[in-house]
Every structure is written in C-alpha cells, then in structure tokens.
C-alpha cells in the first residue's frame, strides 16, 4: 500500500550532468536573476512566438520586461529582442498577423498596430489609463478595461472622479473597504469599454457593462481570461460579481453576454448557479462558449468543472462532471472538437486534452507545471513549463504527446548551481488515507542533513513539482538542507473530496498528516536528520506554525511563521474576503458559531508555546493583516521565547520586490542556521 517513488529522475540527472565541477550553492540573487517568461502569443501561421522575457535590475530594485520574438520554424533558435517594441508591453498577434501592443505617449499608454515588416500606427488617443485590451479576429472592434467611476465612456471617466473633501478621511457605507493590498475607492470599478475600428483608428465608443455594478475583470487577480470577444466583434462575454453589501461573502461570479456596441444591456447567462462561473472562452467556429464553474456558493476551492453552452440554443452541459480534477486554464483546439486545459494531479500540473463530444480526458505532457497553453493547427500546443528544478521555458507538444523544448533561457545560470534531487513519496496519513509528499536534497551534500519542513498555504494548494519566485524549494535546500513538504488533507490535485476534507478541520487531519509524513520521510531516508528540523510556512502554512507551536511544541528546533493566522476571532473580522474564513469554519460568521473558530484557534494554546520563532509580515497584507503577526510576536516575547520579527512596510501577503525577497531569505537562513547549526553542506573532492 505504501509507495516510495523516485519521480523526476530524468530531470534531476540532466541537471547533475550539466553541473560543472566547481558548482556553488544557489542564492536568492540567482533566483531573481533568472529570466522570466510572459504569456506567449503565437502568430496565426504558427511560425513565430511573441512574449516578454523579463530580467531584474537590482540597482533599481525592479524587473524589466523587454518583448522577444522566437522563430518556431528553426530548431535551436533563441529568443531575440524586438527593437521596434522597446518600451512596449502587452504585445500580441492579431488574426491578420499584425502585432498589437501598448506603449506610452505623453505619459499615457496608447494602443498601436504594427504589420509584420511595416511601421507601427497609433490607433488610440485614450484620455485615461487602461488595464488591458482585446482585438476581435475581424479587426473591426477593440475592447479595453479600466478602473473608472460610474460614467458612460472612458473620456468622461478621465475627468469624473468624485470630488474629494479637504480632509484625508476615507468614507465607506459598505464593504469592500480594502482588498488584497489596496484601499478601495468608493464608486470606482473595473469596467469594459468598446471601440469600433474605423480607418485603422478607434472610433465610436460604448460602455459594455451597462448598469452593472461590479469589477470585470474581478479583483485582485482577474485578467483577460475573464473576458471574451467574438471573432466578428459583435459580442462580449465577461465574468462579473455584482457588488453590494454581501460582496465580501459571495463567490458568485457570473458570465454575462452583451453586444459590443452597447445597444442593449448585458444578459446573465449563469444566473442559475450561485457559485463561481468564469473564464468564458469562445470556440473558433463561434458556436460554443466554454467556461469553468464551481457549484457551491461561498467556496472558492470547489471543483472547476468545464461547462459548454450552445450559443444558438442556450443548452448547457457539464463536460468534465465525471472527471475528479479541477480545470485550470482552458483553450480551444482550432477545429473546435477538443479543449486543451491544465489541471493539477499528484504534485504535477500537465496539459490535458478534453474531447468535446465524449468528455474523455487524456494527459498530453509529463511531469512539471504547465501554463500559458496555446493550441496549434497540428493538434498540439505551445506552452510554458517549469519544475522544482528550473523556471519556465517554452515547449511544444504534438497531437501524439511528443514534447519538444523550444527554449533554454536560464541554462547558463542553472549550470553553475549545485544539483538537487527530487523525490515524491506516499504514506498512510490521517485515517490511514493515502497522502503524498516530496523531499528535495542537495546532491553534493554528505552526512546527516538538517530538515527544512515546509508547509504550503492555501490551504487548498500544493507546492508540488513547480518553480516559485517566493517559496522556492530549490533555493531553500541550497545551504545543505533537505526540504520536506507534505500535501496534507485539503491539498489540491487528489480529487475534490480530499480537498474538501480540511473544511472545519484546520488543525486536525492536516497536523496528523504532517506528523506521519515527517516520520515516514526520516524513517525511509537515513540521511535526513530527524532530530534537527525547522518548520516553515506562510498563510495557512503560517497558521500551522502557530498551531504547531501550541500543539506539537517539542518537535522542531525553530519555526518560521510568515503571514499566519494567530487569532481566528480577530481574523474573522479583519480579513477582507469573508467568504473564505466563513466557509473554512462551517459556513457561518464568527458570531453565529464561535465554537467552530475557537476549536482550531492558535491563540488558545499560547501557554504551551516554547519553540523559537521567526515572524514575518507585510504592512500591506489585508488578507491576513499584519496585526496577526504582531500578536504572535507579542505572545513570544511575553513568554520569553527566543523570537524575531521582520516587517516589510511595502509588501502585501507576498514578498515581491527583489531586495525585500533577498532580505527575506537572509533572515530565514540566518534563523535556521542559528538553531540547526552552521552551514551544513559538505562537498565531495
């Protein structure tokens, strides 16, 4: 029953073979110097790919995003910067092969069109900043979205923000008050505006969203995937959650259809579903609208089922109802007979093909985390893929599932770094259910390895076989640590029942899984030093550090707690997306069922705390406000427990700025080395 698998061995061996004799440990600076792919746009003839390939300017503490082109017809071709697009962004191919992009003119982004081999032409003269755009395949319609007050057109909105008081006070009479890392501007929403293209310029304008009050795309993370424009430019489909007093407790995004010329109000196509409906995606033949839906209202981690709506009849069917995985991105194949999607499966996130007629799902790619999938005319796709070993590169898969690497943009830097080995394992977790985990070890290390026991956030999530520029498992192993992580009950990629099992059980089965998983890993691998471990986690993982401090206080030499919940009662009233904390505790507000929150409340067990803890938080974190971190630190200091507090005034729930990230790793490594010993790596001659 218990299985011990060495997966990703090919990738690990390849890295070892490429590593020079004088390899060195990876650093946080190395991580930030990696080139990062933007979403690729493929030319209609399939011969070229257009994308950003960003780099870090440490002196300016920011990333640059130059646009590159790759010749897909030439094996071994390397991405080349497009000189004509210097300073531009959001570049994409149109159906006619021309390149559309945004570029600043007198301090404000404008839309340009550049035919291949021709000169760019400015199409717009926007009087206000926009957030994004789409161009119809016919080229006769452009839609843009932008944060605007209630105003009928973009130009009016530029001068119609509400007059402000001479005082500095923000005034609200309903939530949201703040969202993610931003104080909400009352009356301002992300709205869609549509322009007819006349003589190569943007002409007649209309507001597509009509009198709807809500953000489209949704905030804080929605983008162009939530908006679709028909090929003929006549119809717009978009996801929107109607704003109101209950918005912070509602996950009810709906799909609306509206004429692009604003001639009639939007129509709600998914009014019957109180859960989330999003990612409207039109088939190439224009007959079918695909989208993903979650059935349960108030639950942001319900299964993503692909729905198909016949646009002529309105008939809708659940294509993947019988497939127990959640669809990520959704892309139509050119023949409209299948969909290419991404979905997590046991720590991997490959590309899958879904047959539209039967709903049959076939895996197309191997291990790693795929994204940015674009279907190709030969039945395959071009996509980005990363792994725990390396960041994104561009790949191609054909209709038979044969994968070809198209780029290797970080090869030179990766070749300098110490190799690592990655291994997945399964064990009997809580209730003897099958639970998965992984270990990552520096291949050159000898002797016993201290353990960095990393707990993922979400809690509905998975670190898995993927690259992160925040919690990077390969980097965490660099000083000579064995990184161990467990996909406890509640994790994603194992079926919906497993994901659901954490609801109302935050400190129950997950903690039991962590205990059993660490015991299994150390019993299976004698190189792991079971008596020398530190635990680390952020968000739910940070909550788990606070929970471990009181409920498993003798196991670890130190804890690293980032943006974790300390007091469930305060969290219930301080966080902004109320649907999350309410669903996780049985679907009720704190005042309706205090016992559900107090059952798993770390603050109730502070008297048992004794493990040294590093606490990290960001002042702009409105998801788990920084006051939760201050409270943890106060408890530690009041009890005389060795502790340290790091506060980033300019970061949110994530640490994103390069120098802040480097400081984060310096503090984390310093804390672990203090309690687990000095730099432990020992090199072979």
Where are these regions (language model features)?
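Active-site-proximal cap/loop segments of hydrolase catalytic domains
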Residues: 485-685
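Conserved beta-propeller blade repeats
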Residues: 35-49, 83-102, 127-145, 179-185, ...
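A detector of repeated loop/turn-to-beta-strand junctions in beta-rich toroidal repeat architectures
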Residues: 64-66, 108-110, 189-191, 252-254, ...
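Beta-strand-rich domains and repeat architectures in extracellular enzymes and scaffolds
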Residues: 29-65
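Predominantly five- to eight-bladed beta-propeller fold
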Residues: 64-65, 144-201, 206-209, 239-242, ...
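Short loop/turn segments that connect beta-strands within beta-propeller blades
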Residues: 72-75, 115-118, 197-201, 259-263, ...
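Cap/lid segment of the alpha/beta-hydrolase catalytic domain
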Residues: 400, 409-531, 538-539, 571-573, ...
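Short glycine/acidic-enriched loop and turn motifs that connect beta-strands
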Residues: 55-59, 105-108, 149-152, 243-246, ...
């Amino acid at each position: 029953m218990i299985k011990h698998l060495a997966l990703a061995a090919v990738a690990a061996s390849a890295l070892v073979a490429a590593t020079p004799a004088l390899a060195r440990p990876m650093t946080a600076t190395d991580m930030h110097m990696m080139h990062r792919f933007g979403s690729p746009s493929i030319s209609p003839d399939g011969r070229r790919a257009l994308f950003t390939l960003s780099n870090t300017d440490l002196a300016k503490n920011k990333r640059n995003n130059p646009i590159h082109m790759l010749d897909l017809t030439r094996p071994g071709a390397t991405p080349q910067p497009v000189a004509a697009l210097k300073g531009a962004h959001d570049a994409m191919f149109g159906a006619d092969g021309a390149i559309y992009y945004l570029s600043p003119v007198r301090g404000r982004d404008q839309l340009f069109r550049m035919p291949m081999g021709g000169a760019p032409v400015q199409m717009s003269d926007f009087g206000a900043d926009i957030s994004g755009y789409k161009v119809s395949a016919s080229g006769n319609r452009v839609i843009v979205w932008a944060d605007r007050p209630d105003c009928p057109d973009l130009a009016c909105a530029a001068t119609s923000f509400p007059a402000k008081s001479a005082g500095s006070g923000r005034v609200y009479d309903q939530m949201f008050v703040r969202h993610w890392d931003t104080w909400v501007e009352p009356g301002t929403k992300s709205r869609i505006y549509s322009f007819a293209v006349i003589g190569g310029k943007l002409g007649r304008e209309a507001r597509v969203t009509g009198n709807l009050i809500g953000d489209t795309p949704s905030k804080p993370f929605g983008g162009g995937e939530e908006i679709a424009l028909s090929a003929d430019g006549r119809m717009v489909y978009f996801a929107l959650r109607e704003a109101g007093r209950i918005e912070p407790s509602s996950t009810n995004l709906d799909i609306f259809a509206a004429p692009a010329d604003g001639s009639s109000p939007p129509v709600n196509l998914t009014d019957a579903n109180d859960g989330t409906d999003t990612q409207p995606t039109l088939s190439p033949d224009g007959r079918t609208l695909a989208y993903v839906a979650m059935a349960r209202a108030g639950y942001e981690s319900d299964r993503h089922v692909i729905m198909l709506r016949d646009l002529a009849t309105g008939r809708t069917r659940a294509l993947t109802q019988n497939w127990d995985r959640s669809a990520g991105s959704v892309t139509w194949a050119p023949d409209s007979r299948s969909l290419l999607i991404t979905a997590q499966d046991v720590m991997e996130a490959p590309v899958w093909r879904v047959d539209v007629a039967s709903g049959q799902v076939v895996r197309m790619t191997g291990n790693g985390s795929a994204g940015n999938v674009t279907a190709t005319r030969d039945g395959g796709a071009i996509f980005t893929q990363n792994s725990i070993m390396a960041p994104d590169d561009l790949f191609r898969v054909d209709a038979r599932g044969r994968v070809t690497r198209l780029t290797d943009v970080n090869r030179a830097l990766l070749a300098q770094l110490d190799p690592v080995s990655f291994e997945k394992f399964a064990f009997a977790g809580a209730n003897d259910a099958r639970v998965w985990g992984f270990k990552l070890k520096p291949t050159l290390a000898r002797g016993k390895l201290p353990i960095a026991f990393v707990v993922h956030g979400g809690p509905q999530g998975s670190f898995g076989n993927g690259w992160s520029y925040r919690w990077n498992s390969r980097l965490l192993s660099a000083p000579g640590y064995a990184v161990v992580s467990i996909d406890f009950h509640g994790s994603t990629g194992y079926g919906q029942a497993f994901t659901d099992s954490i609801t109302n059980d935050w400190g129950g089965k997950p903690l039991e899984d962590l205990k059993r998983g660490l015991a299994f890993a150390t019993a299976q691998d004698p190189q792991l030093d079971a008596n020398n471990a530190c635990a680390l986690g952020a968000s739910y993982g940070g909550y788990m550090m606070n929970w471990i401090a009181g409920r498993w206080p003798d196991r670890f030499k130190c804890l690293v707690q980032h943006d974790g919940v300390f007091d469930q009662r305060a969290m219930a009233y301080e966080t902004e997306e109320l649907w999350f904390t309410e669903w996780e505790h049985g679907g009720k507000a704190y005042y309706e069922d205090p016992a559900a929150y107090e059952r798993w409340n770390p603050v109730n067990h502070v008297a048992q705390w004794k493990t040294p803890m590093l606490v990290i938080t960001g002042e702009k974190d409105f998801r788990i406000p920084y006051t939760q971190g201050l409270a943890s630190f106060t408890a530690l200091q009041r009890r005389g427990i060795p502790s340290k507090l790091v506060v980033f005034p300019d970061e949110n729930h994530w640490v994103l700025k390069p120098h802040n990230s480097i400081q984060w790793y310096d503090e984390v490594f310093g804390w672990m080395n203090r309690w687990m010993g000095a730099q432990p790596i020992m090199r072979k001659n």
